[in-house]
Amino acid sequence: MSSPVLKCQSVHKVYVQGKESIEVLRGVNIALYPEQTVAIVGASGSGKSTLLNIMGALDHPSSGSISISGQDVSDMDEKAKARLRNAHVGFVYQFHHLLPEFSALENVCMPLLLRGVAVKEAKKEAEYWLGRVGLSHRLKHRPGQLSGGERQRVAIARALSPRPSCVLMDEPTGNLDPETAESVQALLWDLVRQNQTSFVLVTHDYRLAARMDEQYSLEEGVLAKVAPNSL
C-alpha cells in the first residue's frame, strides 16, 4: 500500500480560556492517501476547521503528530512548515482570501513565486490554470471586478497551480448561491480527479460528502468514520 500524503495520529487540541479548558479534538486519527477523497462533516463549532488547519500545519495540536508527505511537522519551525505547505498542500476556503490589490493572474502566481519559480514561468502556469477554470478572459481583473463564483474559481486555480499532493477545502462553495455552487463543485471535482490530487473536504452538504471515497463525522471532538448511506 502506498504511503499517506497526510497523516494525523492521536491529535488533541485544547483551548484554555481563563481557568477553563476546552478540548476541541480528542485523539483524532486520519490518513489521506494518493488520489483519495475524504469528507468531514459535523455541526458548526464541532472543530472541523480547527482540524483542517492542523492537518495543513497552519495550527499546531496540543498533543499528537502530523506528517505531510512523510515529514513530521512537530519539530519544524514556522519557515520550514511554510515551505512544506507550499510544496505539498493547497487550500480553498469558503471565503476566497484573494489579495484585493492584485489581478487574478497575480493572485494565482503568488504560491509559485513563493516556491522560487521564475516570473515568466509562474505567469505561464497561472494562465494555464485560469484557463482550466474558465477565466482566460479575466486575467487582469481584480477580485472586486469578479463575481463570487469567479473569485472562487481564481482561488481554486491558485490552490492547484503549484500541483500539490493534496488540497484541503473548508466549505469551498458555502458562500455561493446554489446554481453557482453546483458549477464550482463540478469544476473542482473534475480538476482534482484529472490531476490525481488527494483532497479533504469539510462540508455541511451531506449529498456532496457522499460522493467522496470516505466520510468522517466529527462530534464532541471525536472523529469517526461513517458509511455514506448514514449521512
Curated annotation (Swiss-Prot):
This is Lipoprotein-releasing system ATP-binding protein LolD. GO terms for molecular function: ATP binding; ATP hydrolysis activity; transmembrane transporter activity. It is found in: Cell inner membrane. It is an enzyme of class 7 (translocase). CDD domains: ABC_MJ0796_LolCDE_FtsE (cd03255). InterPro entries: AAA+_ATPase, ABC_transporter-like_ATP-bd, ABC_transporter-like_CS, ABC_transpr_LolD-like, MacB-like_ATP-bd, P-loop_NTPase. Its EC number is 7.6.2.-. GO terms for cellular component: plasma membrane. Belongs to the ABC transporter superfamily. Lipoprotein translocase (TC 3.A.1.125) family. One of its GO terms (biological process) is lipoprotein localization to outer membrane. ATP binds at G42, A43, S44, G45, S46, G47, K48, S49. The complex is composed of two ATP-binding proteins (LolD) and two transmembrane proteins (LolC and LolE). Residues 6-231 form the ABC transporter domain. Part of the ABC transporter complex LolCDE involved in the translocation of mature outer membrane-directed lipoproteins, from the inner membrane to the periplasmic chaperone, LolA. Responsible for the formation of the LolA-lipoprotein complex in an ATP-dependent manner. Keywords: ATP-binding, Cell inner membrane, Cell membrane, Membrane, Nucleotide-binding, Translocase, Transport. It is a peripheral membrane protein.
